[in-house]
């Protein structure tokens, strides 16, 4: 409820033509979130607006409004549109429009316009003559007759072929292109659908071995990268000749030439050019046609464009010991009600180094050493949280660094709601940025790999269902081999039971067809996979764990559909034995 109250105070509601006309009388800048009644205002930017309102502190000249397009005649062109639209009204004139929840672009626009208003009020500049933009209808927009600032980006798609993925070449490609300045929006290992392979490789469809190529691409694990480029130009240092001598009238001398480094601006290589230069084109193919890439993204990653437009982010959250011990469940309810998805969570006692990092903003306070002692001797609770604009939203939700500051400026923050008497500090922590969140999540939830196997009796349809379940559970499919498990191969996977009397029956079942051997990666992967797999006997699994894979796909205790390593040590040994065979680089 606290969240809803903050939103009402932050943004005025305009849901009629009369209220729209009144809103245009606002002095200064009004930022208008145009929304449809069926989907509501854009929540992704509300924490940004809250931050701008607090930091700019310009209540007289900065206003935020939500306007329902369905009931306002002026906004008729925006009806039945699902993408967020933000209008900027300056003293009653609509001067700019931003399509999509592009927080950085909105942030820059607001700050620029408010800075101008301040200078105008102070007499430091004349008021610019802005042209009011037309609110055209959908037909005009379709034919490109309107100019507006858009959140759209152009992407390249790269596919690293299955043999190269087995050789871990995808890791090399990712590191190199990121170092070169390309932005990896998505990296995912997956089995490509046939329609994607045919669409991506239309340029070689007339080759005689194309059908064999399609089969190889749809049976192996490829790595797909969606890549964008921040800047089309790059500044490089080059050594150019320069002369030291000055010309004197009537004197002809051979000038002394020296070479000096000069910074020059050059056009950055395209992704394809960079791949060619790095000799990676043999195993990594690139598509740069924007229309085709957009179509392929819709097939492979249907949620990607929505997540980009709504700025879905993952952040690290930490609950201090007093909260963890006494009020964790209440906080988890708030987290759920605020629209966060909890991806991972764990209880942990922080090391001194971790505690000093989390409490760094208090390091100059007298109570700092006592605070560190408290943090390192009691359990804290860490979570990976995801939602629209997650990093900023969590920071705003928890409030400032001290209880005193929170009471003054954020009385509805978690800092105030769950204030503790032991220390004057905020009992919550959040990542400072997206980059910091990635590092902190990797630290507190380090990825782990486990060995997984789908047995021969599982049908192709069931196999694809299992792979879908694996993806939905948050596992990364790191490596995969389809293998006929001979006794030699099976011994590498089942080495712990090779001496058992029933092992010959295991070998018989495995010899009936092709098995799918996989490396699955996520935090706590071994335990998570064993939980998903369920009890060894499918009949027991149906009673104790009816949603487990063995309960759904197992036939009997030998044909129980799937297998997994018992512990991390066993998983590491099997992975080393199975996936480095013939691959000395691994």
Swiss-Prot record:
InterPro entries: NDK-like_dom (IPR034907), NDK-like_dom_sf (IPR036850), Thioredoxin-like_sf (IPR036249), Thioredoxin_CS (IPR017937), Thioredoxin_domain (IPR013766), TXND_domain-containing (IPR051766). Disulfide bonds join 39-42. Residues 453-586 are annotated as: NDK 3. Keywords: Cytoplasm, Developmental protein, Differentiation, Disulfide bond, Hydrolase, Repeat, Spermatogenesis. Gene3D superfamilies: Glutaredoxin (3.40.30.10), Nucleoside diphosphate kinase-like domain (3.30.70.141). Testis-specific. Expressed mainly in round spermatids. Residues 312-452 are annotated as: NDK 2. GO terms for biological process: cell differentiation; cellular response to reactive oxygen species; cilium assembly; flagellated sperm motility; spermatogenesis. Residues 157-254 are annotated as: NDK 1. The keyword tRNA processing does not apply. It holds the Pfam family Thioredoxin. GO terms for molecular function: 3'-5' exonuclease activity; microtubule binding. One of its GO terms (cellular component) is sperm midpiece. The keyword Repeat applies. Its EC number is 3.1.-.-. Disruption phenotype: Deficient mice display normal reproductive system phenotype. It is found in: Cytoplasm. In the C-terminal section; belongs to the NDK family. Monomer. Probably required during the final stages of sperm tail maturation in the testis and/or epididymis, where extensive disulfide bonding of fibrous sheath (FS) proteins occurs. In vitro, it has neither nucleoside diphosphate kinase (NDPK) activity nor reducing activity on disulfide bonds. Exhibits a 3'-5' exonuclease activity with a preference for single-stranded DNA, suggesting roles in DNA proofreading and repair. This is Thioredoxin domain-containing protein 3. It comes from Mus musculus (Mouse). The lineage of its organism: Eukaryota, Metazoa, Chordata, Craniata, Vertebrata. The gene is Nme8.
């Amino acid at each position: 409820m606290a969240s809803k109250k903050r939103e009402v105070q932050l943004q005025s509601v305009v849901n009629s033509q009369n209220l729209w006309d009144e809103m245009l009388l606002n002095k200064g800048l009004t930022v208008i979130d145009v929304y449809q009644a069926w989907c509501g205002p854009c929540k992704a930017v509300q924490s940004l607006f809250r931050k701008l309102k607090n930091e700019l502190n310009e209540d007289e000249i900065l206003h935020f409004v939500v306007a329902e397009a369905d009931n306002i005649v002026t906004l008729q062109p925006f009806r039945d549109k699902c993408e967020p639209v933000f209008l900027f009204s300056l003293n009653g004139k609509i001067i700019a429009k931003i399509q999509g929840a592009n927080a950085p672009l909105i942030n820059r626009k607001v700050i620029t316009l408010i800075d101008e208003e301040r200078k105008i009020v102070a007499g430091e500049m004349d008021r610019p003559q802005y042209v009011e933009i037309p609110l055209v209808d959908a037909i005009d927009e379709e034919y490109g007759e309107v100019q507006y600032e858009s959140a759209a980006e152009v992407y390249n798609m790269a596919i690293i072929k299955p043999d190269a993925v087995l050789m871990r070449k995808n890791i090399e490609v990712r590191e190199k292109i990121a170092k070169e300045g390309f932005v990896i929006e998505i990296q995912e290992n997956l089995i490509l659908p046939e329609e994607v392979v045919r669409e991506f490789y239309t340029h070689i469809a007339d080759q005689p071995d194309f059908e064999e190529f399609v089969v190889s691409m749809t049976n192996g694990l490829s790595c797909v990268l969606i890549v964008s480029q921040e800047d089309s130009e790059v500044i490089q240092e080059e050594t150019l000749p320069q002369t030291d001598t000055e010309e004197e009238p009537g004197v002809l001398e051979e000038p002394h030439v020296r070479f000096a480094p000069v910074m020059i601006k050059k056009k950055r290589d395209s992704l394809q050019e960079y791949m060619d230069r790095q000799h990676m084109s043999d195993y990594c193919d690139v598509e740069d046609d924007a229309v085709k890439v957009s179509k392929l993204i819709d097939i492979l990653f249907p949620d990607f464009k929505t997540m980009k437009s709504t700025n879905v982010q993952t952040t690290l959250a930490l609950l201090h010991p007093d909260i963890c011990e006494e009020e964790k469940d209440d906080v988890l309810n708030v987290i759920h009600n605020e629209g966060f998805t909890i991806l991972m969570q764990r209880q942990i006692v922080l090391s001194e180094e971790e505690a000093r990092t989390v409490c760094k903003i208090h390091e100059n306070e007298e109570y700092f050493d006592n605070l560190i002692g408290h943090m390192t001797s009691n359990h804290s609770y860490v979570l990976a949280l995801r939602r629209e604009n997650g990093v900023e939203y969590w920071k705003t939700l928890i409030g400032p660094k001290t209880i005193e500051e929170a009471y003054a400026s954020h009385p509805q923050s978690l800092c105030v709601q769950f204030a503790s008497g032991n220390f004057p500090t905020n009992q919550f922590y959040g990542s400072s940025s997206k980059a910091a969140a990635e590092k902190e999540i990797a630290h507190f939830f380090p990825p782990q790999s486990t060995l997984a196997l789908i047995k021969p009796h599982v049908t192709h349809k069931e196999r694809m269902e299992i792979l879908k379940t694996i993806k939905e559970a948050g596992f990364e499919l790191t490596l995969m081999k389809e293998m006929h498990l001979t006794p030699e191969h099976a011994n590498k996977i089942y080495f712990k039971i090779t001496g058992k009397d029933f092992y010959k029956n295991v070998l018989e079942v495995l010899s009936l067809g092709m098995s799918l051997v996989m490396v699955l990666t996520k935090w706590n992967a071994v335990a998570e996979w064993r939980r998903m797999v369920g009890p060894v006997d499918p009949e027991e699994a149906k009673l104790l764990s009816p949603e487990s894979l063995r309960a759904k796909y197992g036939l009997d205790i030998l044909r129980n559909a799937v297998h997994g390593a018992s512990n991390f040590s066993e998983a590491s040994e099997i992975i080393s034995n199975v996936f480095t065979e013939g691959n000395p680089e691994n």
